[in-house]
């Protein structure tokens, strides 16, 4: 137990997405140790901060207040004992540099992890308008204006509690449009969309949540 890794999840943006990230972290740990007998003490220690932050993604004017609140929540954690951590939200990586400073360099970037994985490929991106316009993922094939609005509404419905299975079909339509426009892979660039990905049977989807979960347990 004393040798297990201590992982920090900065989540709550939204809560369903970071709960999904926590589950994927445990599942990827199990896959990495397949064949062995895992006891409870073998799993990593995980602190999951599900932070009820204001929606600074839709309202950039709330960004500074959100950052201050997240930093205040992080002060409740003994960061010196954390081995590594990640932000369970794509768009919240707009705050990555500030939060990396707060955590003493302990965070692993989901964005950089994904970019390394897809280097050299033509990528499509379904995400929040903020993630698309920010260029966090560099050049990517994005949905048209109607598609962006549809995806944003799907994300909001996930956060409001609509079952993921009921929303997956609408997302799949937008993903297939990007494939038809030449994307080799399509990235689920919002953690709420990663939840829906479990109900979409397409072999060219990239899930950043799964990739960061694998990275932090290495």
Report residues per predicted region.
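Non-catalytic structural scaffold of enzyme domains
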Residues: 1-218
């Amino acid at each position: 137990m004393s040798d297990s890794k201590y992982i920090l999840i900065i989540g709550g943006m939204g809560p369903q997405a970071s709960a999904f990230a926590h589950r994927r972290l445990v599942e990827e740990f199990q896959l990495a140790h397949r064949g062995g007998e895992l006891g409870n003490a073998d799993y990593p220690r995980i602190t999951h901060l599900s932070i009820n932050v204001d929606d600074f993604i839709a309202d950039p004017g709330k960004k500074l207040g959100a950052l201050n609140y997240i930093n205040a929540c992080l002060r409740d954690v003994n960061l010196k004992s954390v081995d590594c951590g990640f932000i369970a939200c794509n768009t919240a990586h707009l705050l990555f540099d500030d939060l990396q400073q707060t955590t003493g360099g302990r965070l692993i970037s989901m964005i950089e992890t994904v970019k390394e994985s897809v280097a050299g490929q033509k990528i499509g991106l379904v995400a929040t308008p903020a993630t698309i316009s920010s260029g966090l993922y560099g050049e990517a094939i994005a949905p048209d204006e109607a598609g962006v609005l549809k995806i944003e509404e799907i994300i909001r419905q996930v956060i409001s509690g609509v079952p993921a299975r009921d929303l997956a079909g609408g997302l799949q339509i937008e993903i297939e449009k990007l494939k038809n426009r030449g994307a080799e892979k399509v990235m689920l660039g919002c953690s709420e969309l990663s939840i829906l990905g479990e109900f979409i049977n397409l072999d060219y989807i990239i899930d950043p949540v799964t990739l960061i979960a694998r990275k932090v347990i290495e």
